[in-house]
Amino acid sequence: LTKYFSEDIVEGILQDEHANSLSGRHQEATIMFFDVRKSTTIAENLEPQVFAEFLSEFFTDIMDLVYGNHGSVNKLLGDGIMSTFGCPVPTANDVLNAAKCALQIRNHLATFNDVRPDYIKEPIRVGMGIATGKVFAGNIGSVRRMEYTVLGDPVNLASRLESMTKEAGVDILIDGNTRHRLGNLIKCRKVQHQGVRGKLQEIEIFSLDELLKT
């Protein structure tokens, strides 16, 4: 369980406080997608074992930040991570925790690039997308393989926001729902009302600049 959830959530599950939360339900959650840009180029310039070790160590640091902000790692996506805040147990701070996590990843990346190994020739760049809303979360599968899965519009939107960061020239994009729930806790800039693939209507998109207060 500690591979997926933060220690406080695991403790609740083991004490049977949140065990039913894993069986499946509709709930509010904040989703964050994280992706390492140009990872294919990095991989092509390194021996496979070296690249695997680099990515594993780098992801360990990122996942520690997710867990440290009461998030959960839902999926490893090759060169990316899907994490959730509020699954399986929603709290009043899920949106704020996701924003804190993204900003801490930004700061960690700046430090990493200053001391990165010689074999990483160019600074590592990443993109992050955050969206908030109703999702389905629960165990799906069979006796052979079971997986805790999170599905819903916020998952798709967070993924698309992450993919839009490069074009927007920023590292973190959030949807309007996330932005409005954070209120005056953050400094952000509206990118624009923009069409997103799979969405019939344009949505508000913001870049996340900094945390003002908590």
Regions found by a protein language model. Give the residues of each.
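A generic structural signal for short hydrophobic patches within well-formed alpha-helices
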Residues: 10, 39, 82, 178-179
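Alpha-helical scaffold within the catalytic cores of cyclic-nucleotide enzymes
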Residues: 55-71, 87-128, 153-166
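Catalytic strand-loop-helix junctions within cyclic-nucleotide turnover domains
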Residues: 84-94, 128-148, 165-169
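Catalytic NTP-binding/metal-coordinating core of nucleotidyl cyclase/transferase enzymes
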Residues: 19-100, 148
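Regulatory cytosolic signal-relay segments
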Residues: 1-27
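A structural signal for short, well-ordered beta-strand segments
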Residues: 31, 81, 126-132, 205
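Acidic/histidine metal-binding catalytic segments
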Residues: 77-78, 118-129, 171-178
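Cytosolic regulatory/linker segments at or just downstream of nucleotide-handling modules
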Residues: 135-137, 158, 164-214
